[in-house]
């Protein structure tokens, strides 16, 4: 369990500088981090489910769905900040191996919200689907060799 804590919180090495001790002293306890992660992730799922239920509201449903679905996904990704910390999360998001996936996810978030508020509401539904695909690809980047396995599966299916 301690190894899991160290990996998730970004304390892989035992390098203890003065700055790391200050950050550690002012940070949340492991139990509080887990509770924050669970609460934020649960709120994210609740927003996504609520958005799905609002999809069937006449006239305004599609826009509400896009907004709540996007907010739910943002909260779900944001929940991992509790586990790793904000700086470690940002560093990992923009590592070269997942840079394109991160940009696609953020672009889909922005395009979904723009289409829900400014453009055609039907376009928001398409961007929500693209958002799900981009989030899946982004999530797979955290699992070693998962994206390679998915690529090979699609290559076999399409061949």
UniProtKB/Swiss-Prot annotation:
Subcellular location, principal: membrane
Cytoplasmic topology ranges: 1-36, 85-98, 144-159
InterPro entries: Vesicle_transpt_Got1/SFT2, Vesicle_transpt_SFT2
Topology feature Lumenal, residues: 58-63, 120-122
A Pfam family the protein falls into: Got1
Transmembrane segments: 37-57, 64-84, 99-119, 123-143
Subcellular location: Membrane
Function, as annotated: May be involved in fusion of retrograde transport vesicles derived from an endocytic compartment with the Golgi complex.
Protein name (database record): Vesicle transport protein SFT2B
């Amino acid at each position: 369990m301690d190894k899991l804590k160290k990996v998730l919180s970004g304390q892989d090495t035992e390098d203890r500088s003065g700055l790391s001790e200050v950050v550690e002293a002012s940070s949340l306890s492991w139990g509080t981090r887990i509770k924050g992660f669970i609460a934020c992730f649960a709120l994210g799922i609740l927003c996504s489910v609520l958005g799905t239920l609002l999809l069937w509201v006449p006239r305004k449903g599609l826009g509400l769905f896009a907004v709540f679905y996007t907010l739910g996904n943002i909260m779900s990704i944001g929940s991992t900040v509790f586990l790793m910390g904000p700086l470690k999360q940002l560093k990992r998001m923009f590592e070269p191996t997942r840079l394109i996936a991160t940009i696609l996810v953020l672009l889909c978030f922005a395009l979904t919200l723009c289409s829900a508020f400014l453009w055609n509401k039907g376009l928001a539904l398409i961007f929500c689907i693209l958002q799900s695909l981009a989030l899946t690809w982004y999530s797979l980047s955290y699992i070693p060799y998962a994206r390679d396995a998915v690529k090979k599966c699609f290559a076999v299916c399409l061949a």
